[in-house]
Regions:
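Bacterial N-terminal signal peptides that target proteins for export
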Residues: 1-8
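Intrinsically disordered, low-complexity regulatory segments
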Residues: 4, 20-22
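Bacterial N-terminal signal peptides
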Residues: 8-17
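Primary mode marks residue(s) on the alpha4-beta5-alpha5 output face of response regulator receiver
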Residues: 23-233
Length: 233
């Protein structure tokens, strides 16, 4: 039964963006006002910390989104960094139907990067965010990311790193809401065959973003009971 729930949730995540993309192919997409992507700082801090268990997030650096990108509002001491990703953090290349999530201002995806990912992966998401906030479309974002990585302006991905996404208050897209608590594994150049070849919609783990590139992401679910609630302390 639980595997069936996984499949239905994944199919929803896959096909809702695809339907939106097909309906908008006839006209250029426009970004909503930047204010639609922002949150009150206190609320964003609480939501960011809900990405991981308290023993991690209470000691993590917290960054919040402003009109000029992500900025630290709390310096941690364990090397982890927690933020709330927006739709700007959509895949750079594949799956193609996910790329238009940059235009979805409702996305709120709390994530806590481990120390290695905080150094090697977070700058990539920050660059994507800044490019989108300057009005770049998904193709232009991909070009900007590729150019920056080639010039060494983004850290090279040196092996696998990971992040927590355990918040029960995550909203992965309009009409989808929260999904299963899961780990994001940043696995450069991985493709789906390297994690078992699981078909999309089947029980995880499987490749979710940008297979075969430096930015490949493997998603691994954890027990549903490990969800973390965003609560002020």
């Amino acid at each position: 039964m639980r595997n069936k729930v996984f499949s239905l949730a994944l199919l929803a995540v896959l096909f809702v963006p695809a339907a939106r993309a097909q309906s908008s192919q006839s006209q250029p997409r426009k970004y909503p006002p930047i204010q639609d992507y922002l949150m009150p700082q206190t609320s964003e801090i609480v939501l960011a910390k809900s990405a991981a268990p308290a023993n991690i997030s209470d000691r993590a650096t917290i960054k919040v989104l402003t009109t000029s990108g992500f900025h630290a509002v709390h310096d941690g001491d364990n090397g982890f960094v927690c933020i709330v990703m927006r739709g700007f953090s959509a895949p750079t290349y594949t799956p193609a139907q996910f790329r238009d999530l940059v235009y979805d201002s409702s996305v709120r995806a709390p994530i806590c990067f481990d120390p290695k990912a905080a150094k090697e992966v977070l700058p990539y998401y920050e660059l994507r965010t800044n490019l989108a906030m300057h009005g770049k479309n998904p193709d232009e974002i991909a070009e900007g990311v590729q150019a920056a990585y080639g010039r060494g302006e983004l850290p090279k991905r040196e092996g696998v790193s990971f992040a927590y996404m355990w918040s029960v208050d995550q909203n992965l897209a309009s009409g989808i809401g929260h999904w299963h608590p899961h780990m994001m594994v940043f696995a450069p150049y991985y493709d789906n065959s390297m994690v078992g070849g699981t078909s999309f919609g089947a029980p995880l783990p499987q490749l979710s973003d940008d297979a075969g590139t430096p930015f490949a992401v493997v998603v691994i679910p954890v027990d549903h009971n490990l969800f973390v609630k965003a609560e002020a302390k």
